[in-house]
């Protein structure tokens, strides 16, 4: 991965941070909780933030929840390949490809049926100590409820030993700009306690695809617990 795509997310996210913080923190109603759960995470080691996926605003809201000087910024992301967005109308100009990459979103090598190949770019980022935002459900919710997670998130914890921080985003589902401006919704970003390999798997066993799905189910359960405690 070129240095340009490692540096550009830091520049963009830092430049936009004052505006997103002002928008979400002052104009909108929002609440950030659980940052104290990250206090003892080691610096220089990759961290996965496992987030429920409710809207296109999710990748903007997550970095805005951190302080400007946070060691967890910039945030990198998993995304779909550019051709996935070919039926997205005018938005396909921006979705995928260059515009996603400069924000920190890199495509999964989907369809390979191999986690190491699918997550190749993201494994590299984590090995370099970056923060990775991943949406375990693999797509945005259609009814506002949490969906079943895919196994890739747990695979990263197993392969790299990196902590998985469950994150719940609330109030964004089917949120309109009018709702935002009129402050009809309260938005929330809730960070849970980190989960580790031993929280997701039994010690010493050989892993299968079903084991990774079961491990991700533990992560989704932690996100569900955060949802229950929100507001």
Name what the model sees in each region.
Residues 3-29, 87-104, 179-186:
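Alpha-helical membrane-targeting segments
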Residues 23, 102-109, 136-139:
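Short, basic, glycine/proline-bearing loop/turn elements
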């Amino acid at each position: 991965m070129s240095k340009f795509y490692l540096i550009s997310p830091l520049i963009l996210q830092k430049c936009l941070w004052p505006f997103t913080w002002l928008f979400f923190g002052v104009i909108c109603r929002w609440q950030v909780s659980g940052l104290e759960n990250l206090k003892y995470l080691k610096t220089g080691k990759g961290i996965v933030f496992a987030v429920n996926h409710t809207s296109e605003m999710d990748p903007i809201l997550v970095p805005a929840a951190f302080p400007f000087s946070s060691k967890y910024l910039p945030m990198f992301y998993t995304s779909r390949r550019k051709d996935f967005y070919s039926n997205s109308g005018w938005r396909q100009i921006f979705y995928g490809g260059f515009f996603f990459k400069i924000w920190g979103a890199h495509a999964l090598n989907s369809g390979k049926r191999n986690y190491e190949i699918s997550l190749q770019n993201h494994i590299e980022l984590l090995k370099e100590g970056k923060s990775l935002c991943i949406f375990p459900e693999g797509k945005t919710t259609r009814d506002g409820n949490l969906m079943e997670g895919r196994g890739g998130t747990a695979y990263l914890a197993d392969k790299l030993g990196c902590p998985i921080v469950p994150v719940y985003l609330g109030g964004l589902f089917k949120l309109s700009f009018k709702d935002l401006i009129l402050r009809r919704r309260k938005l929330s970003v809730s960070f849970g306690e980190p989960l580790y390999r031993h929280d997701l798997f039994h010690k010493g066993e050989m892993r299968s695809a079903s084991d990774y799905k079961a491990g991700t189910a533990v992560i989704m359960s932690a996100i569900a617990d955060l949802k229950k405690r929100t507001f």
